[in-house]
From Swiss-Prot:
Similarity comment text for this entry: Belongs to the universal ribosomal protein uS2 family.
SUPFAM superfamilies, per database record: Ribosomal protein S2
Gene name tied to this protein: rpsB
Keywords annotated in UniProt: Ribonucleoprotein, Ribosomal protein
Name the UniProt record assigns to this protein: Small ribosomal subunit protein uS2
A Pfam family recorded for this sequence: Ribosomal_S2
Length: 254
């Protein structure tokens, strides 16, 4: 069964592309038709591409890998944060800081600074510091949380990026390319699909469309995680049954 239905895509407005004058000819193969000066995306191809991306995300999750969700445009910020948190992954939904991937060790230093301020706040250090210093530290913390909060626990480079709007996130994409990190992306009719390893041709401007597709990637991760949890429970149950049977056998022999 497909990971997503044509009905879901239509209801979310995934098929609406950009104006015909703002297009990338490389997206031609994903365009169904043109209507009132707007390109209509071929949703049959979107269904197929969502399936490919879904299976790839499941593969990463099965191997214990991590995915960094990236979407800094207004329409994507909430979905990127919510779905990354729901699936236990990482996210960047404010400005992409140059070097987030290519200069990861420096970024880690900023994250350690954030953790250090949070520790000071928790262990009572703030209570003995001058009020002005505390105010400055809280401002610094707020700024660090805004830009780095979503990757605070990311201790190594991600195994893949999930990106909304490659044009908007071109710095993130360039960094991923440099490090050979695969990219899954929601790609509208004005983008270059060649930059993306797993293209999802779709409207990247409608909040509902972005939410639907982002939630599907999170679902793929959770499908794997919940499957693993079920396996652990079954293993524990089987072990308990085996122990009971062994105990019964011993008591029978006695």
């Amino acid at each position: 069964m497909a990971a997503i239905s044509m009905k879901q895509l239509l209801e979310a407005g995934v098929h609406f592309g950009h104006q015909t004058r703002r297009w990338n000819p490389k997206m031609k193969k994903y365009i169904f038709t043109e209507r009132n000066g707007i390109y209509i995306i071929d949703l049959q191809k979107t269904v197929k591409k969502v399936d490919e991306a879904y299976n790839y995300v499941k593969e990463i999750a099965s191997n214990g890998g991590t995915i960094l969700f990236v979407g800094t445009k207004k329409q994507a910020q909430d979905s990127v944060r919510d779905e990354a948190i729901r699936s236990g992954m990482y996210f960047v939904n404010q400005r992409w800081l140059g070097g987030t991937l290519t200069n990861f060790q420096t970024i880690r230093k900023r994250i350690n600074r954030l953790k250090s301020i949070e520790k000071m706040e928790e262990d009572g250090t703030f209570e003995v510091l001058p009020k002005k210093e505390v105010v400055n530290l809280l401002k610094e913390k707020e700024r660090l949380v805004k830009f780095l909060g979503g990757i605070k626990e990311m201790n190594k480079l991600p195994d893949a990026l999930f990106v909304i709007d490659p044009r908007k996130e071109r710095i993130a994409i360039a960094e991923a390319h440099k490090l050979n990190i695969p990219i899954i992306g929601i790609v509208d009719t004005n983008c270059d699909p060649d930059e993306i390893d797993y293209v999802i041709p779709a409207n990247d401007d409608a909040i509902r469309a972005v939410k639907l597709l982002t939630s599907k990637m999170a679902d793929a991760i959770l499908e794997v995680k919940q499957g693993e949890e079920t396996e652990v429970v079954e293993e524990e149950a089987n072990e308990a049954v085996a122990e009971e049977e062994a105990a019964e056998e011993v008591s029978t022999q006695e």
